């Protein structure tokens, strides 16, 4: 009998909640001491409840809470992704700094060097570091 009443009253809660789930939610509200009102929710058609002076639809509230939880999980995933990207950027910046320090060191050595073979070695090392720097930027 109550299932038929619920089927007739709750017409629009969609795929997010089955009739059996709606019955559980509504009966739990009654067990918690809420009073079922004769007015119905404009969104889902289920009866509104009143408890402690607050009038609410337990079906829409349950769906809203589920959406809030999912939204919170998505926000956590986004925050984690941002933190990971920041970490990667910091690593790249650290690597960039190390490469620049090595280039500067080799330039100073190059200024002091007189031997041709050694100048060539240092110049090749600087060239490789510059190519690496361009790749990481």
Curated annotation (Swiss-Prot):
Coiled coil: none
Pfam families named in the record: Auto_anti-p27
Stored InterPro entries: SSSCA1, UPF0148, UPF0148_domain
The organism's place on the tree of life at top rank: Archaea
Similarity section: Belongs to the UPF0148 family.
Protein name, entry field: UPF0148 protein MJ0890
Classification of source organism: Archaea, Methanobacteriati, Methanobacteriota, Methanomada group, Methanococci
């Amino acid at each position: 009998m109550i299932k038929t009443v619920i089927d007739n009253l709750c017409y629009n809660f969609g795929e997010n909640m089955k009739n059996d789930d709606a019955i559980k939610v509504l009966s739990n509200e009654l067990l918690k001491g809420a009073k079922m009102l004769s007015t119905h929710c404009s969104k889902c058609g289920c009866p509104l409840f009143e408890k402690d002076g607050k009038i609410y639809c337990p079906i829409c509230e349950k769906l809203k809470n589920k959406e809030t939880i999912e939204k919170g999980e998505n926000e956590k995933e986004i925050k984690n992704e941002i933190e990971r990207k920041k970490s990667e950027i910091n690593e790249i910046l650290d690597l960039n700094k190390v490469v620049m320090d090595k280039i500067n060191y080799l330039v100073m050595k190059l200024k002091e060097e007189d031997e041709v073979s050694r100048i060539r070695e240092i110049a090749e090392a600087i060239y490789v570091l510059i190519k690496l720097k361009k790749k990481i930027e």
